[in-house]
Every structure is written in structure tokens, then in C-alpha cells.
Amino acid sequence: MATAAAAAAVMAPPGCPGSCPNFAVVCSFLERYGPLLDLPELPFPELERVLQAPPPDVGNGEVPKELVELHLKLMRKIGKSVTADRWEKYLIKICQEFNSTWAWEMEKKGYLEMSVECKLALLKYLCECQFDDNLKFKNIINEEDADTMRLQPIGRDKDGLMYWYQLDQDHNVRMYIEEQDDQDGSSWKCIVRNRNELAETLALLKAQIDPVLLKNSSQQDNSSRESPSLEDEETKKEEETPKQEEQKESEKMKSEEQPMDLENRSTANVLEETTVKKEKEDEKELVKLPVIVKLEKPLPENEEKKIIKEESDSFKENVKPIKVEVKECRADPKDTKSSMEKPVAQEPERIEFGGNIKSSHEITEKSTEETEKLKNDQQAKIPLKKREIKLSDDFDSPVKGPLCKSVTPTKEFLKDEIKQEEETCKRISTITALGHEGKQLVNGEVSDERVAPNFKTEPIETKFYETKEESYSPSKDRNIITEGNGTESLNSVITSMKTGELEKETAPLRKDADSSISVLEIHSQKAQIEEPDPPEMETSLDSSEMAKDLSSKTALSSTESCTMKGEEKSPKTKKDKRPPILECLEKLEKSKKTFLDKDAQRLSPIPEEVPKSTLESEKPGSPEAAETSPPSNIIDHCEKLASEKEVVECQSTSTVGGQSVKKVDLETLKEDSEFTKVEMDNLDNAQTSGIEEPSETKGSMQKSKFKYKLVPEEETTASENTEITSERQKEGIKLTIRISSRKKKPDSPPKVLEPENKQEKTEKEEEKTNVGRTLRRSPRISRPTAKVAEIRDQKADKKRGEGEDEVEEESTALQKTDKKEILKKSEKDTNSKVSKVKPKGKVRWTGSRTRGRWKYSSNDESEGSGSEKSSAASEEEEEKESEEAILADDDEPCKKCGLPNHPELILLCDSCDSGYHTACLRPPLMIIPDGEWFCPPCQHKLLCEKLEEQLQDLDVALKKKERAERRKERLVYVGISIENIIPPQEPDFSEDQEEKKKDSKKSKANLLERRSTRTRKCISYRFDEFDEAIDEAIEDDIKEADGGGVGRGKDISTITGHRGKDISTILDEERKENKRPQRAAAARRKKRRRLNDLDSDSNLDEEESEDEFKISDGSQDEFVVSDENPDESEEDPPSNDDSDTDFCSRRLRRHPSRPMRQSRRLRRKTPKKKYSDDDEEEESEENSRDSESDFSDDFSDDFVETRRRRSRRNQKRQINYKEDSESDGSQKSLRRGKEIRRVHKRRLSSSESEESYLSKNSEDDELAKESKRSVRKRGRSTDEYSEADEEEEEEEGKPSRKRLHRIETDEEESCDNAHGDANQPARDSQPRVLPSEQESTKKPYRIESDEEEDFENVGKVGSPLDYSLVDLPSTNGQSPGKAIENLIGKPTEKSQTPKDNSTASASLASNGTSGGQEAGAPEEEEDELLRVTDLVDYVCNSEQL
């Protein structure tokens, strides 16, 4: 799909859907909400294809089905009943709401004929309608967060451009860029359509930040793409292919020019080098990257070869650097192409540099470009679009026509600049060719080209080619000439180069003067060219004279260049400096005219050169250029020198006026003649660094426009400069690089060149002693500030003056004095203005923003300071001081404008702490943003990181996709492949089924095991404890029964032996030993029933069994009572108190029938209190126990049966009495509720039964009390009391009662008090009843059992009397005791024992019999023993029955 997308993009017409912002919107909607709306999936290329109108012969004039389906679904989703055959009519109706004009067009022409923009806008409108008219969709969307509904840009670059990244399901990539404040989509552009373009874009973005990457990439790619234009990568990308072509052409041009350039530059490039070096110094800042780009591929080879050639040629030391420069210049044209391809500000300077080569038209172009540079500097503070408009006005009008192919209006000026830069590079290459081949022609053409660039770009290029051709023919002669006079001719060439470059710098000022200057240069150069052998001598003479004239003119041109630089600076500082610059320009132009006349006169001694140069210059340039052309070389050179030197001077000259400018120019002309010689040497270096100089010029442009680019360019040029300087040092060429004040920004590489250039200067001085020039030290080291640059220029001028003739020395002295004055004035002006500009340079010096630049600059400074420590150190110190003074105001000046004003509007980056004014950003911010804010460089880095992640992810996805496709392709030839894949799945499925079956079987087995384990657990658990309980219980019971430990056997006889004993005694013993085990035994019995209960756990079984067992005890009592003494129960006289206590005891008995856990707890709690009082009385009641023990045999016989029956009743009762569970918390309420329920049960059973029970209760209350007390004692002992506890209770007697009673009142005041009161009178009456206690105890048991029967009968239906009629062996002794024990004894035990123990045991019992048994293991075991005895008795009785 990616290839298809690329093909579609290539074939797409200008109205390609991919270039429309709506296309990205629709794609984003389809990707985000397509599945939700069930829309057809359309990858990017497919959507582009269907939206584009197919050719008439394709598709039969039908709209693609995919597009129709998409529209149909979208319209139907918003409630339109659309049919497939009439969908266009419905679409027209919808379009009426959206755009009536389009609806009319569609109605007339049909959907197929509509423009892509219209189709996309309609499709976007339909998509947006979903949010309003599709209710179902709307409801779903309303739940989403707004941020999740939107696609956010992936990042922003240094220039404020937003990058949008989209990826579809087929891994097709689209990346778009646009201005942040773009409202109409005018800046929208698609820059990436496939993976490779994404990688290229990422490389370009990285190169902008990391100059090393840029350098490497540029070396790898001749294309200037790699030296990215800071402003628009989009333009770069679009222009990349044309740039590559242009680069190839420029390389070819350069290769052709190289022989010519090498020969011409042997002489002419010396001059050009000086000028080029100056320009390079200026340009290096800006041009360094483009220069590097140019140099990167061609330069390494060409420069190395040239260096070798230069080293091989002794005389060509001057020429050698020229050759190097020629190749570098060739690289420059490449770079210019690249820079042109990349709409970088590099163009103007490069064009200026190339302008030297091409024509006066180019010179005019260069001047316009310089003006544009100034504007760019000024516009750097203006929003991009405005800048672009202004730049397009400035640059595009002169340059655009042939060169610019602007992708977007904003980028047009960039492209224009790039193209101009390419032209300048070509011009530079021609300059180099001319310099090597035809020095005179080169100079002339260079000046012509410089003059011409303002006028026409095409003629410049034409001249460029002509120059190459011309340079070819004279190249040989000139090489020969250069051998003899190479140094002088080179100096003249350098002068012309410098002049051209000065013109470039001062181009806007010089538009008028540029033509004349270029003509002068052309004359001088052509005169030199015309006189190949002697003329070169003349050329050298002319160059010296021209240098003088140039020095005078250079004062003017330098003032102009200064004004240019001042203007360039002023845009940086703000447009304030322009008016003085304009004045300077006017003065400079006037002075130039006068100087041009003077220079023409001075040059007249060389009439041949001048006329020829004028002829050539007139051809390319204007007649003015012809007139002033000979001095124009000087002027250009001087302008270059002066412009570099005299940016300050320009300001000062603007203040001083035309006259002062003229004076300065005269002095500077002298110095410049010397300086031109120096610069010729410099031109050798500069042309080696020729690329660097245009790069600097462009760099200055770029600096003004984009500070970001400057660093990489400078860094790259720094390396190139070092190489060039090393070559020049070998050659012995001395370079004086004058740094224009505007290039305050570190031209660190030029600085590096300066120390090397000084060495080369020394070498060249030795070689060029005939010339007698002392090379100026390059002011680049101090370039960051205009003051330093001027000071350095002055010092360099001083050095030159010393090495040169006395006239030159005088001129240098005058220039020094003038420059000092000018420096003072300019320092005042520039301190106010330049200092504003300086903050940029200062900031860069501080390294806060352009760290790379400053690193290089610091290195260069260190190198330069090594050679120039005396001058540079003081100057740098001054710069630092001025910078510190400015920075002292604010630690963080704006990194964009360098001004610390309005600190409240300076935003600090959250990652690097760089400060930026809100108005200096692009687009400017009106408010301080919330949250994190990152400066443009940091945003650029983040963008690179994110794009790199996306690229890696894309590579992974594409690899997977490719593998899948390969697999499919392979499988196509294997028919069984699919089947081969499926069969393994089927066996897997069968295995899964088998596993499932096994799992199901296992689960069933687990279930069975679970049930069996329940039974097993209960059985094994109970039997273990049961055996132990039997042993322990039997031993204890036997010991107690025998009067303390008479050991009987553990066989049944011993158990049945208890039958002879009083049940009370046995029960007491059992109580003491086994409090809970009885429950456990009951639980076991119950668990037998429970085996049918799936839900019941062992714990529940035990609990229920215990409760049932207790209830069964009560029921047994009832049966026994009714059977044995039905009459006695009536005979017993009832006492109200006793009846109350009996009633409570009955409640307690019944209590077990209620939910077991609660009932146990309640019983334990309540009986504790009630029967704690009875404990003392029970001691006196042992007689009654004895009498009961007589009946123990009978009880034991029928006890089990009655238990079973009662347990059954208890089950029923449990159902009825689960309500009591609520009253666990309050025993009082439980008791009351129990009483009420019992009463209710009595009523239910029968009123008669109730009456009989009441009468029985009243009669047998006292007896019942006594029996209950004994039973309570037993219950206590069995439930929770160890024998020691019981003994203590018996011993303490009343005190224990008091304790328990207190506890009772605390816990259950109402019910317990009532019971306690009833119990107390019963106690009082007990002594009376003692004689008849035996029977009475029986009776109360009977009575209780009868009452319980009534309560139980409520569940049953029969009357309790029926039970009394039933003949059962008397088990009263045991059953009533046990029942009472369970009901009463346990709670009494609780009351007697510490509440903690009682509660703990109760909770344990309630939670599970196991817990209860463990807690009171011996007691429970005894209880179990009793239960076992009961079972044995029952078995015996049943056998007897």
C-alpha cells in the first residue's frame, strides 16, 4: 500500500486529495470512528484514488463503489433514507445546506466532475453531521473525553511548524505540516507519504539540531536537504528532488568550472578569497551549513585534490587556496542549490557571493537579498506569514521568477532564497573557475554578477556559464600568469571578490553603487584577464591601485556594507537602525560615486583592464557599472572589508555624514588596498573557505531569520575552515577575514581560520613580500560583537598597514583613527543598537542558546587568541564586558531577540531553561501558557524523538506485514497448506475435549469425594474424640460414683452400674466432667439424620445435634413424668415463685429447640443466672438426686427413645423457633420471647393441656425448682464447669450464688431477676420440701416434661397427656437431669464460671462441636460418655422391649 500511495502521490495532480487538510480530517474520522459507524475501510491511497476524478476512459464515468458506499452509509446514519441509485440527489440536498454553489455545480456537472476540494469538504461535512444527527452515535460520543476524540499534532519544530502524523490500518503513512496560526489551510502540506520519506524527514529534522548529523548527512547526500532550511522542511522535502537535480547540475557546473575556476582563481581568487573570506566570515555564520553541504561531498575530494595540487605547485600557494576555494565554491553552488532547495536565508549571501561570479544583475539581486536579509533579521521578530510576505516581496520578486518554486507562499521566499543561494553558489563556483582560469574575467564577471543579481537571476546564471567558458580559455594563461604574478593578480581577484562580497553585504545600500562597483570590479578583473601575462602584472598593479581606490571606495563601500550590516543588525536589533543605515547608504552611494570616479581615474593608468572590464561589466551590468567598474572592484573589496570592519563605521559614517565617510573611505581605501592584498590571501583561504563565506553570509541571513540553523552551519564550516586553513597554512597563504559586525554571531570556524590564516599570512608574507602586505587578522573571533569586529578589523588594518607600503600604512593609520572614532561612535550607536543585537551574540557566547556555535566560537577564539591574544583578548574582553553589562540587567535575555526587556513576558523552557519572549515565538503567544512549555529547540528535539519512535514502530509493522505477505505467497503454491494448518487444530480440539471429559470426571470424583469426606470427617473426627471421651468420662464417672476414684471397668456393666445410683449424682459428676460432650453426642446422633442434609456442615450438625439432644432430654422428662407419676405432678402444690422458676426452666428446656447456636448461647447465659442461685440448694437437694438415681435405670432404658422422639420434635420446633435467633444479644428478650412462645404453643396444643401444665407447674413448682436446681448443677458441670468449679460452687455455696446472681442481674436483669426471685423463695421452701424431695424431684421432672411436651406438642398436635399415657420405662432420672443440664446447667455454668470462659465455650460450641469439644475436651468427653451410656441403656431397653 505504501508503494501504491507513493505512486498515487506522484501521479496526483496539484489538486491531489493528500494536499488538502480535509483529507487528513476525513482519514482521521474514518480511522477513529469508522468501526463504530460500520463504515468501509479505506486506506489513505485508496481514498485518494477514489476521490480523484478518474480519466474519462476509466470507470465508465461512474463514481467508485467504495466512495458511493461510504456516502450511503454516512447519509443513512443521519436518518436519510437513501437509495444507491439516487444517492447523488440526496447528496445534493445535503449539499444545499452546506454550500449552495457546490450543490448547483453538482446538479449541473454531477458528482464525478466536482473538484477534489469539494468532494472532500462534502465528505467532511457528512462526517461532522454524525456528531449532531446520529443520535445513537452522539450518545456514545458524549461519554468520551474531548481530548480522546481529537488527533493531536505529533510535535513542532524549531520554526513553529506543527507536524501531523497519521497511520492507517495498512501501515500507510502520512505526515503533514502547517503553521500553528494557519486558519485557511494555506500552509498545509503533505511531506511524508511513505516510510522512506519519513526517514528522510527525520534525518533533516535531526540535522537541524545536530550539525554533526547534518554534516554527515550532507556528506552522504550532496543534496542540501541535509543542511535543512530552518524554516520549512516541507519546502525542503518538496524541493529535495529538484534540489538534488540542481545539486547535480551545480556539481556538473562546478566540475566544469573547477578547471576554469582553478586557473582563474590562481590570480582572481586571491582577491576573491579576501572578499570571499570576508563574505565567508559573514556568511559562515549563516552559510556554514550550506557551505558545508556544498563542500561536504565535492569539497573533501576536490579540496583534498586541490590542496594536493596547491602543495605540489609552489607558486600556486596563493592559487592553491584558490583552487581549494574553487572546489569549495563548487561545493558552494551545490550548497546553494541545496540551500536554495532548502528555503534557507543562506540564499542572499550565497547569491551575493555567486553574484561576484555571475553579473551586475546578480549583484543587484544580492543587494536585494541583503536587504531581504536585513528584512529577514527584522522579520525574525515578525510572525512567519508576515515575514514570508515581506520576504516574498523582497526576495521573490527579483529572485523567484526563474529560481523559486514555492510550495507555499510562506515557503516561497525560502525557496527563492534557496534558489538565489544556488545561484550564488553557482556564481561562487564560476568565481572560483574564473579565479583559477580567467582572473580578470572572473573578477569582472564576479562584479557583474554581483551587480546583476539584483536585476536578473537568469542572466546571472547565463553569465555564470559564460564565465565558466571564458574562464576555461584564459585559465591556462592565467595559471601561467599567476605563477609569475599570481600573488598580485590573486590579490586583485581577492579584492574583486571582497568587493563583490562587500557589495553583497551592502547590497541594499549599493543597489546603485553596486552596479558601478561591480563594473569597476569587472573592469579591473577583465583588464587583468585581458592582459594574461603582463596584464597580470598590471592586474597586480591595478589591484594595488584598485586596492588603494578600493580602500577609498571601500571606505564608502565599507560604510555601505556597514550600513548593510547595520541594517542587517538593525533588523535584528529592530528596525530602529534602518534610518541611519539609509542615511549611510545614501552617503555611501554618494561617496561611492565620487570614489568610483576617483577610482576610475586611479584605475585609468590601467586603461586596458578598465575598458575590457567595463565592456564586460557593461555587458552584464549597467553603464554605471562600466563607469565605476574598475574602482568597483576596489569598492566592492573595500566595501567588503569596510563592511566587515565598518558595520560600526557605517553607523558612525551615517552619523558623521558623507564627508566623514569619504575621508574614512580614503583611509580605508588605503588600508583596503593593503587589506585587499591581505584579503587576496584571505581569498585563497576564503575560497578554500569560499563555501564558508557564502555560508556565513547566508548564515547571517539565517541567523537573522533562524538562529537555530546558525549553529550547525557554523560548526560545519568550522571544520571546513580548519581544513581549509590547514591547507592554506601549508600553502603559506595569509587570510585576513574581516567579520562584518552583523556577524557578531560566532563565526568560530572563520576564527579558526584566523589563527591558521595568521600562520598562512606569515607564510604568504614571506612569499608575498613583493606585495608587502601584512594580512589582517580575521575579526571573526570577535565577530559576535560589531565592536570587537571593528576593533579587530582596525588591528588587522594596522597589521596590514605595517606590512604594506607607507601609503597603505598611512591609510591604515587613518582607518585606525577613523575606525577608532567610528568605533567610538559606532560603539555608542551599536552599543545601543548592536548591543541589542549583541544579546543574540552574547547569548550565543554564553552558549545558552547556540551552544554548538559558541563551542566552535570559543575554540576558534582560543585558537585565534593564541595568534591574536594581544588584540583579540582585549577585544573579547570588551565584548564580554559589554555582554556582561547587557546581561547584568537580566540573567535570561530572550534567546530570539537577545533583549532582556519585559522579563515578565519571557517564557522559560521547562527542559533547558532558555528564555523567550512570548512575542518572539512563532506564532507569538498572547498569553502565558498553562502547564509545561518547551522552547522551539526542545520541541524540535521532542519531535525528532517521537518521529523516531514512529519510524521504528512502522519498520516493525512493515516487517511483519512483509512476512505475512511472503507467507501467503508461499502458501499459494501449496494447496494443502491451509489444511495442514487446520488438522493440527482438530487433534488439539479432540485433545481438549478429552481433557474436558477428564476434567469433568475429576470434578465429579471431587464432588463424590467431597460428600464422602464430609461423612468421613465427621465419623473419623467423632470416633477419635468419642473413644477418648468414653475413656475419660467413664473413669471420671466411676471415680465420682464410687466416692472418688474407685476404679470400675470401662465395660457396659460399669456404665449400667450407674443405674443404681442417683441420677442426680451421676448427672452432677457428668456435669462436672462433661459439660459439652453431651452436645457432641447429640450432634452425632443428629448427624446421622444429617447425612441426608447436603447443606449441613459438620459444625451445624454437631450444634443441631447438641440442641436436639437437649430438647430430647426435656422430652424424655416429659414422657417419664407422664408415665411414672401422672398424678403426682398434679399433687405437687404450686407456688407462684416456683411456677415462675419452672416456667423459666421450661423456657430453657425449650430453648434448645430453637436455632441451635443462639439457643445454646441464650441457654448458657440465662440458665447461668437462674440456676446459679440453685447451686447452693442443690447441695441440700442431693437427697432428691439420690431418689432420682433410683429411677436412673428406668430413665436410662427409655432415655434414648425419648431423646429420638424429642429430637424429632426438636427438628420441628427448630423450624418453628428459629425466630429466637434474633435475641442472641439480649437474653432477657429471648427469655420473654421463649415464655410467650411456650404459652403460645400451649394454646396451640390445647387450652386443656395448657391448663394442666399450669396446674402441674403450680403444684410442682417447688419440687420442680429443686429438681431444676439439681439439673442446673448437672448442666453446669456438664457444660462448662470442671469438677473443681462445681466443688468450688458447692463449697462456696451461697457466695457463688451471689456472684452468679450478680452476673445474672448484669446480663439479664428483668428475666433473670424474675427467675432469681422465684428461685430464692424456692430455696426457702426447699428445706421444707427436702423430706419429700425424692418423689418431688420426680414430680417436677414429670411436670417439666409434661410442660415441655405441651410446648413440643405445639409442633406435634397431640396433647402432652397422650405422652403421659404412653408406657415408657422411667428414664426420668437421667433425661430430666440431662435436659435440664443442657437447658439450665450450661447457662448456670456460664454464670458461675468466668463470663469469658462461658462465652468462649459457648461460641466454640455454637461455631462447631469440634471447637466446643476441644475447649472443654474432658467435660465434653464425659458428656459423650453419658450419651454413650444413654445409648447403651436405650439399646438394652429396646432389646428388653
Swiss-Prot record:
Its main location: nucleus. One of its GO terms (biological process) is positive regulation of DNA-templated transcription. There is a cross-link at residues 277, 456 (Glycyl lysine isopeptide (Lys-Gly) (interchain with G-Cter in SUMO1)). Residues 874-887, 1094-1107, 1120-1141, 1189-1199, 1280-1292 have a biased composition (Acidic residues). The modification Phosphoserine is found at residues 227, 392, 397, 429, 473, 524, 570, 604, 622, 629, 748, 882, 1096, 1098, 1105, 1221, 1223, 1226, 1258, 1277, 1325, 1336, 1345, 1359, 1375. The modification Phosphothreonine is found at residues 628, 1278, 1305. Residues 17-84 form the DDT domain. There is a cross-link at residues 136, 215, 236, 243, 248, 252, 254, 277, 284, 288, 294, 305-306, 309, 323, 327, 337, 342, 358, 373, 381, 390, 400, 405, 415, 419, 439, 456, 463, 468, 498, 565, 662-663, 670, 677, 698, 709, 758, 768, 795, 799, 1039 (Glycyl lysine isopeptide (Lys-Gly) (interchain with G-Cter in SUMO2)). A zinc finger (PHD-type) spans 891-941. GO terms for molecular function: histone binding; histone octamer slider activity; zinc ion binding. It comes from the Eukaryota. Residues 864-873 have a biased composition (Low complexity). InterPro entries: Rsf1-like, WHIM1_dom, Zinc_finger_PHD-type_CS, Znf_FYVE_PHD, Znf_PHD, Znf_PHD-finger, Znf_RING/FYVE/PHD. One of its GO terms (cellular component) is nucleoplasm. Residues 215-227, 482-498, 552-562, 1394-1408 have a biased composition (Polar residues). Residues 234-257, 274-283, 330-340, 359-378, 467-480, 500-514, 565-601, 609-621, 753-770, 789-802, 816-831, 1335-1344 have a biased composition (Basic and acidic residues). Residues 215-283, 330-385, 467-634, 675-887, 983-1007, 1063-1428 are annotated as: Disordered. Regulatory subunit of the ATP-dependent RSF-1 and RSF-5 ISWI chromatin-remodeling complexes, which form ordered nucleosome arrays on chromatin and facilitate access to DNA during DNA-templated processes such as DNA replication, transcription, and repair. Binds to core histones together with SMARCA5, and is required for the assembly of regular nucleosome arrays by the RSF-5 ISWI chromatin-remodeling complex. Directly stimulates the ATPase activity of SMARCA1 and SMARCA5 in the RSF-1 and RSF-5 ISWI chromatin-remodeling complexes, respectively. Component of the RSF-1 ISWI chromatin-remodeling complex at least composed of SMARCA1 and RSF1. Within the RSF-1 ISWI chromatin-remodeling complex interacts with SMARCA1. Component of the RSF-5 ISWI chromatin-remodeling complex (also called the RSF complex) at least composed of SMARCA5/SNF2H and RSF1. Within the RSF-5 ISWI chromatin-remodeling complex interacts with SMARCA5/SNF2H; the interaction is direct. Identified in a centromere complex containing histones H2A, H2B and H4, and at least CENPA, CENPB, CENPC, CENPT, CENPN, HJURP, SUPT16H, SSRP1 and RSF1. This is Remodeling and spacing factor 1. It comes from Homo sapiens. The lineage of its organism: Eukaryota, Metazoa, Chordata, Craniata, Vertebrata.
